[in-house]
Amino acid sequence: MSTTAVERPASRGATEARRRRVVGLGALVAVLMVGAVASLAVGARALSPAEVWQGLFAAPDPDRRLTEIRLIVQTVRVPRTVLAIVAGVALGIGGALIQGYTRNPIADTGLLGVNSGASFAVVTGIAVFGFTSPFQYVWFAFLGAAAAGVVVFGLSSIGRGAGNPLTLALAGQGVTVFLAAMTTAIALSDLKSLNALRFWNAGSVAGVGFDVIGPVSVFIAAGVVLALITLPSLNLLDLGDDVARGLGVNIALSRTVGIVAITLLAGAATAACGPIAFLGLMVAHVARHLTGPDYRWLVPYAGLLGAVVLLVCDIVGRLVVRPGELDPGVVVALLGAPFFAALVRRGKFRSA
């Protein structure tokens, strides 16, 4: 058998795999668009597609009914939908990256302490500085998340085992426990902080305007760019540090850029929405099942899946207790816990 005869089936197989992945990305984009339209229509007051269109594009009109529809769509549901998509992309990509860099199949973005850092910053801002609005404490939350990520990375980079994924995980766990204890102590001593933290911790995309979404999206976009830059080296790191080093990868630089990307993505999303557990863990596993271990495909899939899942969970939360609402962070946790248990039971953990 000639070499050419062997190469042709392999080439056809690679082409077919690429075609399936492209089709899959297109399907996810289509599902996301349908979900966005549904998100604009579903709520305490259901809107028809025609009313959604009017709410988006109709010119200002003295008609009270049309004015009410415009207010619902443009002021409430459009920002909510955009934030669900942006935060879902950030948490999905962050989940895929953290599993890759730690080679830990059950790692989530909370491993870097960003959730506990953001929570600590929120209660500090409310209790010490008297912050009352999301626009005020969202920036404190982002700074807290970023600071926690820096501390975790710094602790994991010194002493014996520096740069080891296990050291990173242990440092993250230590910082998380410490900040969680501090957060609880402050919240229990200040009723206003406790009430604000209780609602923020549920994980919600409601009540946040474009004055917050716009700046947060800039940090998320920066994180996405850094994530895309690291994908080739992340594929090589997946083969092991020694192999990657032999192929010319600057391991320290790659991990540093990756951790910065994860901190930007998870920190900004958590600051805007509150902590949303299990999302990054779930979508990274689903993306790996659909695409295989190639991070050039896995990361885009994880981002789109994160957006779809968070958007769908937000819609479900509006429907199940209508006319009330269930925060999407709660719905994601209700889905994520059984998913995690199923992974454990079936032994589906694969090295990231």
Describe these PLM feature segments.
Residues 2-352:
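Alpha-helical transmembrane segments in inner-membrane proteins
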